[in-house]
Structures are given as structure tokens and as C-alpha cells.
């Protein structure tokens, strides 16, 4: 059922997470931007095209296809290798503590967790930075 729904759903009919468009445009040009996702490649490419942001990303690594799923460190390392960036010089922004923060730490990256109203208690590992909105991603202290 899930596969049939995914195949029929228009993945390009998506909206920006608040602050995402601002963050991408603010970071573009000064930083190399990649994406590490556990999402289906076809769905993810439709979403990026629907938002008109595919050109912001120099590399997109799909966990479960190009490498093991996050939180495994391998998809992060694959993206970094393609970007030519050392882990200690990179930051990963994500909304899943389990996949994004744990994976970023396993790969040696700094982490920014989009809490989006969720409580920040008893998290292991503790994210390097916590933001409530992607509006906060375009500015210091983490860039």
C-alpha cells in the first residue's frame, strides 16, 4: 500500500519548511551544500525539483541506495568525499535526532538539530546546536 501511494502521490507538490529557502539562499555561494537523505531517490528528486532548489545541492546521497541508511556514518562520508570537505569542517542539519544527529556524530561532523518544538532532554548524543526554525540556520554560531 505504501509503495502504491508513493508512486501515485505528486511528490513535486511540496512546500518549504519555514526558513529553508532563506537558509539555502544565504548559504549558497559561501558553502558547499550537500544532502544526505534516507528518502526514496525518485521522491526526493521530485521534491527538490518541485521546490526549485535542486541546483543548491552539489551532491545528494540516498541512504539505503548509495550507502547504508543514516545513522550509519557511510552516507555522510560519501557526501563529504564528493564535496571534498573534511568532516571536522562540515555541519549537518537535520530534524531527526536518531538519523541526523547520531549519524553526524558517528561521521565526525558537527550537528544542528531542528527541534521544531520538541523537548531537548536526555538526548544522546547531545546536538552541537539546536534550532527551532531553519531561519536560524543561515546565521552564526554554527556556520
Say what each PLM segment does.
Residues 10-14, 38-39, 68:
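Short, flexible loop segments at the rims of nucleotide/cofactor-binding pockets, characterized by
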Residues 25, 32, 40-41, 45-143:
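Asp-based, Mg2+/Mn2+-dependent phosphohydrolase catalytic module
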Residues 16, 37, 93:
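Charged, low-complexity surface patches
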Residues 7-33:
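Short, acidic loop-to-helix structural element flanking the phosphoryl-transfer center
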Amino acid at each position: 500500500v505504501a509503495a502504491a501511494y508513493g508512486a501515485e502521490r505528486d511528490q513535486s507538490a511540496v512546500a518549504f519548511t519555514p526558513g529553508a529557502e532563506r537558509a539555502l539562499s544565504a548559504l549558497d555561494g559561501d558553502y558547499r551544500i550537500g544532502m544526505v537523505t534516507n528518502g526514496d531517490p525518485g521522491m526526493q528528486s521530485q521534491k527538490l525539483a518541485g521546490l526549485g532548489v535542486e541546483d543548491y545541492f552539489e551532491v545528494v546521497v540516498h541512504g539505503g541506495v548509495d550507502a547504508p541508511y543514516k545513522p550509519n556514518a557511510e552516507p555522510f562520508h560519501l557526501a563529504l568525499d564528493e564535496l571534498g570537505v573534511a568532516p571536522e569542517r562540515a555541519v549537518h542539519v537535520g530534524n531527526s535526532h536518531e538519523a541526523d544527529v547520531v549519524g553526524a556524530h558517528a561521521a565526525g561532523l558537527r550537528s544542528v538539530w531542528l527541534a521544531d518544538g520538541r523537548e531537548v532532554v536526555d538526548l544522546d548524543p547531545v546536538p552541537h546546536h539546536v534550532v527551532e526554525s531553519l531561519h536560524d540556520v543561515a546565521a552564526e554560531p554554527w556556520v
